[in-house]
UniProtKB/Swiss-Prot annotation:
One of its GO terms (biological process) is photosynthesis. It is found in: Cellular thylakoid membrane. It comes from Gloeothece citriformis (strain PCC 7424). This is Photosystem I reaction center subunit IX. Gene3D superfamilies: Single helix bin.
Amino acid sequence: MKGLPKFLSLGPVLLVLWLSVQATLLIVINIIYPDLLFYPLS
């Protein structure tokens, strides 16, 4: 139980980092392939 507060405080930090990585990847993919978000691939 000693590591539980550290784990709970680490969760929001990891969430923010993961969402930042996902947003950055989505922006980069949208810059390289701008039509993928609006039209199907077929």
